């Protein structure tokens, strides 16, 4: 797993993903495609960027591991945006999610943040074989860098 920061994003990468690199808070993470290690290192990677996690936005609920980590380890208020109602119901029924986690059923591409966040983690899967992939990634980085100090998007390194 590795990452590029705003000042280190090359023009080639920026143009590929249609990213405005004028701000230093754009971050792209990439991995070897090992989903376990991606999840394992997302929290550690975010520590490298900032020490303040009071308000966190996470796109994608998954099994709730990443939101749970921020809420319990960093005492963060976590907003999770998830578009799958069945997944939300299943995870909420387990009853283990921290009280600081607020799940909103919405699409991260159309969701309008109501507040600023210390970090926005896009823990969602993109279809990297689809040409829309690059547009989707760039649009999320550009959109959430306005309301967040850091934007982190895991990308597969193929």
Task: Report the location of each language-model feature.
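Charge-rich, low-hydrophobicity low-complexity segments
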Residues: 11-19
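Short polybasic amphipathic segments
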Residues: 20-32
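Long alpha-helical, hydrophobic tracts
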Residues: 17, 32-42, 91
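The AdoMet/dcAdoMet-binding core of the Class I SAM-like
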Residues: 2-12, 24, 41-158
């Amino acid at each position: 797993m590795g990452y590029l920061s705003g000042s280190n994003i090359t023009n080639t990468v920026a143009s590929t993903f249609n990213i405005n690199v004028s701000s230093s808070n754009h971050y792209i993470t990439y991995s070897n495609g090992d989903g376990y290690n991606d999840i394992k290192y997302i929290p550690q990677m975010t520590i490298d960027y900032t020490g303040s996690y009071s308000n966190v936005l996470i796109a994608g609920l998954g099994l709730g591991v990443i939101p749970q980590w921020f809420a319990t380890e960093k005492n963060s208020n976590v907003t999770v945006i998830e578009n799958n109602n069945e997944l939300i119901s299943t995870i909420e029924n387990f009853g283990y999610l921290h009280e600081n986690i607020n799940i909103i059923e919405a699409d991260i591409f159309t969701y309008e943040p109501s507040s600023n966040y210390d970090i926005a983690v896009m823990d969602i899967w993109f279809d990297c074989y689809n040409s829309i992939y690059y547009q989707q990634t760039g649009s999320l980085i550009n959109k959430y860098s306005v309301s967040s100090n850091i934007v982190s998007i895991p990308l597969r390194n193929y």
